[in-house]
């Protein structure tokens, strides 16, 4: 409901509330919301009220429920995991062509990278996400990450390759296309 409240406050007229498990179609796209968990950051669960004022500061957002999304288009599927945690039974048996996987705070979840690879049947392409300076305005500045973050991204790729050696891991750069 929090996302719906922010969307409506932002002027989005047509909002569909989902809870996970639905199958939706939007023209050539299919979208399946998948129930999930937020990273183990210790952030309290809260709801964003319907009377929220936008734009919001980053610290005004709350964890009000987490979903992941399986998107289909033109015979291909992409799984978007936007936070470093998941419900394994919800992912078991999914076989996406591409998995977009959050890397931030994954170290708090036991065997995070390999458990995802096993649950998804070792997808051929993994894109890292949730590693940039996401509190900065959208643009090139978001990719100004430090040496520690770069080393963590290399470690993520090594984790994936340790249990899924054929998987290609890409660290995306904003506004650069990636062939899938």
Regions found by a protein language model. Name each.
Residues 1, 79-84, 99-104, 125-132, ...:
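Active-site neighborhood of phospho(di)ester-bond hydrolases with catalytic His/Asp-centered motifs
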Residues 1-18, 94-100:
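Active-site metal-binding motif and surrounding structural segment of the metallo-beta-lactamase
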Residues 2-3, 20-23, 36, 103-107, ...:
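Short, acidic/turn-prone active-site loops that include or flank metal/cofactor-
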Residues 9-10, 89-92, 111-119:
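A short acidic, amphipathic alpha-helical/loop segment
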Residues 11, 30, 95, 121-122:
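Short loop/turn motifs at secondary-structure junctions
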Residues 14, 101-111:
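Active-site glycine- and acidic-residue-rich loops that bind
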Residues 16-23, 93, 118-180:
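Binuclear metal-ion centers of metallo-dependent hydrolases, dominated by the metallo-beta-lactamase
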Residues 19-94, 109, 174-180:
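Core dinuclear metal-dependent hydrolase active-site scaffold
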């Amino acid at each position: 409901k929090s996302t719906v409240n922010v969307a409506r406050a932002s002027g989005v007229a047509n909002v569909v509330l989902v809870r996970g498990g639905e199958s939706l179609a939007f023209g050539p796209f299919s979208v399946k919301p998948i129930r999930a968990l937020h990273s183990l950051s210790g952030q309290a669960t809260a709801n964003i009220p319907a009377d929220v004022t936008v734009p919001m500061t980053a610290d005004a957002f709350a964890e009000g429920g987490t979903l992941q999304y399986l998107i289909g288009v033109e015979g291909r599927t992409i799984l978007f995991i936007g936070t470093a945690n998941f419900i394994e039974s919800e992912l078991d048996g999914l076989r996406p062509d591409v998995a977009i996987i959050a890397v931030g705070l994954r170290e708090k979840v036991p065997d995070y990278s390999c458990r995802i690879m096993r649950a998804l049947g070792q997808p051929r392409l993994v894109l890292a996400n949730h590693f940039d300076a996401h509190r900065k305005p959208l643009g090139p500045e978001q990719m100004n990450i430090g040496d520690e973050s770069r080393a963590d991204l290399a470690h993520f790729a090594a984790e994936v390759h340790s249990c899924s050696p054929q998987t290609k891991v890409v660290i995306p750069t904003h506004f650069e296309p990636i062939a899938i």
